[in-house]
């Protein structure tokens, strides 16, 4: 049997709309992500389990892990009968790369089980294709960090899909999921079709400056440049309590705060555990809206998807 874990990810990381993503894992060692296991069988089957199993589609063929199996078999040119199990630990529509977790774990588990017939670039291409079926357009800002780990910058040139960006080991990423759902398609539809020239210039300056600061080890500058002029000004109306949470993060001393992916999860960067814990407590008391919500203090997951056991 092969079992693969794929970690949560932050799409956009505020400053890089659709071109930047970061994988994260809780500091307490718990798994914030999905697991998919594959074992030999006479016929294909898919079993679902985990905390968020009730959110999955009733029709197995609509399950993204079934589609992983189907696409993988098409790609290698033969049908591989396997029993697959999806452990759905990630809420759907959370802004934590939930679909990416299932896609990455599903395709990587099949590839490992079959003796790695596909290389990482081909596998990542298929992951982007499947992710596109869900969100409506191919983008890699969740699947790339989820699969490869760390902070990834999407390039999509010269046969290169993404490359890693140097990161800051002492940063703590406080992740708060309020327990409500925001559809990626809805969150994209709310964005303007055209942007003001000044916003385009600011976006270019922030993103270029952030990447430069990461490569030159300037943590304070990198954090200061984590600003979103593309999505956040429009998406905050979908996120009750976000403005108050951002203010609380600033008051507590967080270095940066933003929307993870299309929301509703909020992320905040702190450089000491005391501030991170204070902010986590505040978010738990004030940002969560129901029992499905959670807060985790994380670090970057520099490994990405991996086999367990």
Swiss-Prot record:
Q: Which residues bind ATP?
A: 91-101
Q: Nucleotide-binding: present as a keyword of the record?
A: yes
Q: Name the enzyme's class.
A: transferase
Q: What is its EC number?
A: 2.7.1.39
| Compartments, record wording | Cytoplasm
Q: Which GO terms describe its cellular component?
A: cytoplasm
Q: Which UniProt keywords apply?
A: Amino-acid biosynthesis, ATP-binding, Cytoplasm, Kinase, Nucleotide-binding, Threonine biosynthesis, Transferase
What GO terms in the biological process aspect are recorded for it? Answer: threonine biosynthetic process
Extract the InterPro entries matched here.
Answer: GHMP_kinase_C_dom (IPR013750), GHMP_kinase_C_sf (IPR036554), GHMP_kinase_N_dom (IPR006204), GHMP_knse_ATP-bd_CS (IPR006203), Homoserine_kinase (IPR000870), Ribosomal_Su5_D2-typ_SF (IPR020568), Ribsml_uS5_D2-typ_fold_subgr (IPR014721)
Record GO terms (molecular function): ATP binding; homoserine kinase activity
The reactions it catalyses are: L-homoserine + ATP = O-phospho-L-homoserine + ADP + H(+)
Q: Which Pfam families match?
A: GHMP_kinases_C (PF08544), GHMP_kinases_N (PF00288)
Its UniProt pathway annotation is: Amino-acid biosynthesis; L-threonine biosynthesis; L-threonine from L-aspartate: step 4/5
Indicate the principal place this protein occupies in or around the cell: cytoplasm
NCBIfam families listed in its UniProt record? PRK01212.1-4 (NF002288), thrB (TIGR00191)
Return the similarity comment.
Answer: Belongs to the GHMP kinase family. Homoserine kinase subfamily.
Query: What does this protein do, in the record's words?
Result: Catalyzes the ATP-dependent phosphorylation of L-homoserine to L-homoserine phosphate.
Report the protein name in the record: Homoserine kinase
Which gene codes for it? thrB
């Amino acid at each position: 049997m092969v079992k693969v874990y794929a970690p949560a990810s932050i799409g956009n990381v505020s400053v890089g709309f659709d071109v930047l993503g970061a994988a994260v894992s809780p500091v307490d060692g718990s798994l914030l992500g999905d697991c998919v296991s594959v074992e030999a069988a006479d016929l294909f089957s898919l079993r679902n389990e985990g905390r968020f199993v009730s959110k999955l589609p009733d029709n197995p063929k609509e399950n993204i892990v079934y589609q992983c199996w189907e696409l993988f078999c098409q790609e290698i040119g033969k049908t591989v009968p396997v029993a697959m199990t999806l452990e759905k630990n990630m809420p759907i529509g959370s802004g934590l790369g939930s679909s990416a977790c299932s896609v990455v774990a599903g395709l990587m588990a099949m590839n490992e089980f079959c003796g790695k017939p596909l290389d990482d670039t081909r596998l990542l291409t298929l992951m982007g294709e499947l992710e596109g079926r869900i969100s409506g357009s191919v983008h890699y800002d969740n699947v790339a960090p989820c699969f490869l780990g760390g902070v990834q910058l999407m390039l999509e040139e010269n046969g290169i899909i993404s490359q890693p960006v140097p990161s800051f080991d002492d940063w703590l990423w406080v992740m708060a999921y309020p327990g409500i759902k925001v559809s990626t398609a809805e969150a994209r539809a709310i964005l303007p079709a055209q942007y003001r020239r000044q916003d385009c210039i600011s976006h270019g300056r922030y993103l270029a400056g952030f990447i430069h600061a990461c490569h030159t080890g300037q943590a304070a500058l990198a954090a200061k440049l984590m600003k979103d002029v593309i999505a956040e000004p429009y998406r905050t109306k979908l996120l009750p309590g976000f403005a108050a949470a951002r203010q609380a993060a600033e008051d507590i001393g967080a270095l940066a705060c933003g929307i993870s992916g299309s929301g509703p999860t909020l992320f905040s960067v702190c450089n000491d555990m005391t501030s991170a814990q204070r902010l986590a407590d505040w978010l738990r008391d004030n940002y969560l809206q129901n029992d499905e919500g959670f807060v985790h203090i994380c670090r970057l997951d520099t490994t990405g998807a991996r086999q367990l056991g």
